[in-house]
Amino acid sequence: MGDLAYWPAAKPLSKKNTFAKNRDFIKNLDHIDQIWEKLKFKCGDTLAVCDLRGKYKEKFSYSELADLITKVSSSFENYGLKKGDVVTVISENSPRWLAVDQGLMRLGAINAVRGINSPSVELDYIIGHSNSVGLIVQSKEIWLKLNNKEELKKRLKFIINLEDEQFESLISWSTFISSVEKENSQNNNLEKFNPEIDDVATILYTSGTTGKPKGVPLTHANFLHQIINLAYIADPEPGTSVLSVLPIWHSYERSAEYFFFSCGCSQYYTIPKFLKDDITQIKPVVMATVPRLWEAIHDGFFQALKKMPSKKQKLIKFLISNSSVFKRSLRRIRNLDINQITFKSKIPLLGSVISRYPLHKLSTIFLCPNILKQLCGEKLKFPINGGGALPEHVAVSYTHLTLPTSVIV
């Protein structure tokens, strides 16, 4: 690998904190991929992952997924992969991406990841800079956009096509996973590769907008820190529905997914184009999001509001405005704003809160639930916003709808 900037694992939270129930096994892991055998026995029949919009719309229980990961890992070994080897993976969210990711980790191998919309020159650079010995592409179209195909065919141990198409010298997915003998496919040789917590798990590359992409290795310790410490503030039950719309190769989405999987949640993959449909169909309890997504939902609601009859528009806007002033006044009285106020200044605000409360209460009973049902599928309790703060007007709107967004920056 070329010169890489290592990001040290953060220190764990104080042991005085009570660890989330039924999750003590996480503390004793050295590798992310070790969670699957634990989850296989803890919640094996629970749906682990479902691809709503992918080519094959595959879904797997935790037991099925654990077995697939073991099989994929054995197949990689059969193709000559060993601990410390790097494989470039160019693909978007799918159960196959997840199986490849965890199968590589099972061997102690490393993946250099990127999305399918990256420029070809950027993808060429990542494959070379990471010293990859193998390549995995989502489809033949991704393979065709690369510039040095002939050189890659000679140098790489394998080039795998996740979408299973037979094309040139690419190895189809079905051929790849059937390359290992059945009796060995369920043989979990985890300890043979001497997993260590400081092993590099993945290399994430920047977009390259200010020059060549920069590779940042993350270790298993980095990811395990996230899994362990997020459990102190959230502990969803097995089977809790999670809708995943962000790219899985992004560090924030990836860390969130590992955490949700460690809880036994059921994750559904979608894409932004179908988010509105899938959020009402799946009715997720948890979502990992970014500000732009909430802005789009917010703007979509107010665009839809414009199409309503004039009287209905005015009524809804009045009720939202009333709740807006009520919530803002209440925050200031409680000194939750940055600029705190004196007791004397709180007196007129208290009058505003008292006078606006009845209509606000009616809104929370009759208006807000209907709006939230249309926007978020009625069950969303933990919308996690990462990567930056919400614009103030968007944050205020969701707060008025009694939808708190947990922020992780």
Segments from the language model and where they lie:
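AMP-dependent adenylate-forming
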Residues: 8-18, 35-60
